Structure formats: C-alpha cells, structure tokens
Amino acid sequence: MELQFLGTGAGQPAKQRNVSSLALKLLDEINEVWMFDCGEGTQRQILETTIKPRKIRKIFITHLHGDHIFGLPGFLSSRSFQASEEQTDLDIYGPIGIKTYVLTSLKVSGARVPYQIHFHEFDDKSLGKIMETDKFEVYAERLAHTIFCMGYRVVQKDLEGTLDAEALKAAGVPFGPLFGKIKNGQDVELEDGRLICAKDYISAPKKGKIITIIGDTRKTSASVKLAKDADVLVHESTYGKGDERIARNHGHSTNMQAAQIAHEAGAKRLLLNHVSARFLGRDCRQMEKDAATIFENVKMVQDLEEVII
C-alpha cells in the first residue's frame, strides 16, 4: 500500500508543485489505484509515474474548486484511449454537482467514453460510511471550507491470520484438505487420534491500515474524527506559522493547525500537502520544523513523492 502525490500545490500550478491530486496504490491488496482529486495537469503527472490509467478504478473528489477538478474531464477522456480489452468501469465519489460537471464537460467537448462511469454524490445528509467492499470501508465528513468540502477516511479491514504451514508439517499433519480446514479455523482430528487446534497454528489477525485525506478546510473537529488513530494523515497546509487569520478567512489551515489535528487524533504520521506557491524550498523545510514542535512525525511532501504505508 502506497501513496503517491501527483500534485501538492494550492490554487494554481507552480514550477515546483502541480495542483491537488494524489493516488492511493492498492495494487497488492486489490489490484487497484484510487485517486483523490484531479486538478489541472494530473494526467501529465501520471505519465511521470508507473500508474496505469486503467488501474484507477475509483476517484474521490473533496470539493468542486477548480484546482481539485479541472483535470478530471481530460483524464477521463484520455483513459478511453486504452485498448478495448483494457477498458474498466470507474466510480466517482464527490459533492453534489460533480456528475453535472463531468457529463457537461464531456458532452460539450464531444468526448466519447467507452467505459461506464458510476457517480456517487453526497451532501450533509448522506455522509458517514459512503462505500464498503470485502476489504475496505470509506467514510466521509464535511469539513469547514468556503464551499461544501469532504474529508475521507479509508479503513482497511483487519487481515486474517496466516497459517503456520511449517508447524503443521512438524506436527505430522499431511498437506491437503486438512490444511484448508485448519486455515478456516476448524479443529481437526488426525488418524492417530490427536486433536489439532486451529488457533494454535494461525497467527492473530493483523490490524488493517487507516489513511485519512483531509481536503481544504479550516481547523475543525471533523478532521480529528476522520483522523482518529490513522496510520497516515494527509492534511492541507496552505499557510504557515502565524498565518492563522488569513488561513481562516480563506477556509484553509496552517502547518501548525495540521499538526494539532494529528496530535489530537492520535495519528501515527502526518504528511503536509496543498502548499501555497509563495512557500519555496527553505520555507517548506521551516514549516516542517515548526509543525514538528507539536507533532514530531511530520513531513512536507513533494510532487511525485511516494510514501509506503
């Protein structure tokens, strides 16, 4: 499981940072990539990675400001250029209005998309758990931006314990159907009368990962709720220390407020994202150091950076 940041800037493209988009790579888990936001130029950024467009099966939009959605019609159109046998359907999750925006853009431009797009739109009344599969759950809450904006919490379900095959062989259990029964938690009796207890040969379930992605927002309790005990918290950091007033006026957060959220939520790691173009390399390093005075395990991410979860 990995995160790759396709765009880490705020508002408009800059020389060092493209606008918002990140990919959650779940290739080992479900052979899919989930994308969060799709700002202008996202498909160009994807060309700099190993991500295959057909693997992107779900797109989660935080809100409808242009720096988070202007790349979506182009990406969807280009995705249709795959060979016919590689076409895969796509789900798009986001605020009410995302369906109209996408379909209107495709219609006006004459784009022909040969795969199915399934839209899932949300407002205040439909938040909470918005998606569930056999391996993952996704939750959404409203944040505190200048327009309706959602934060996402991706929860991997606990992984089953693994079977200790070597210990079973050492115990004289013949390889075959009995292994399957024991793996399913079933006790078995051997021909010599010995009872093999499944729990003695299966490791404890492994807790799944939690990834929280916070879109544009002022400091809010909803962010703490979404980030509770998260393995990774991706939080916007449009402004720096001392910029609290301007951040609030524009519906954004500072690096220090992001660190406070991570601390209050008990997150394990904080990745600062969505950085104003006025902050250059030295400034970003200082923002990281300042945030570390509140939450130690913090990093300011860069475009195309990969983070293993």
From Swiss-Prot:
It is an enzyme of class 3 (hydrolase). The keyword Zinc applies. Zn(2+) 1 binds at residues 63, 65, 145, 216. The keyword Aminoacyl-tRNA synthetase does not apply. Keywords: Endonuclease, Hydrolase, Metal-binding, Nuclease, tRNA processing, Zinc. InterPro entries: Metallo-B-lactamas, RibonucZ/Hydroxyglut_hydro, RNase_Z/BN. The active site is at residue 67. Its EC number is 3.1.26.11. Gene3D superfamilies: Ribonuclease Z/Hydroxyacylglutathione hydrolase-like. Coiled coil: none annotated. It catalyses: Endonucleolytic cleavage of RNA, removing extra 3' nucleotides from tRNA precursor, generating 3' termini of tRNAs. A 3'-hydroxy group is left at the tRNA terminus and a 5'-phosphoryl group is left at the trailer molecule. Zn(2+) 2 binds at residues 67-68, 216, 274. It holds the Pfam family Lactamase_B. One of its GO terms (molecular function) is zinc ion binding. SUPFAM superfamilies: Metallo-hydrolase/oxidoreductase. CDD domains: RNaseZ_ZiPD-like_MBL-fold. Binds 2 Zn(2+) ions. Zinc phosphodiesterase, which displays some tRNA 3'-processing endonuclease activity. Probably involved in tRNA maturation, by removing a 3'-trailer from precursor tRNA. Homodimer. Belongs to the RNase Z family. This is Ribonuclease Z. The gene is rnz.
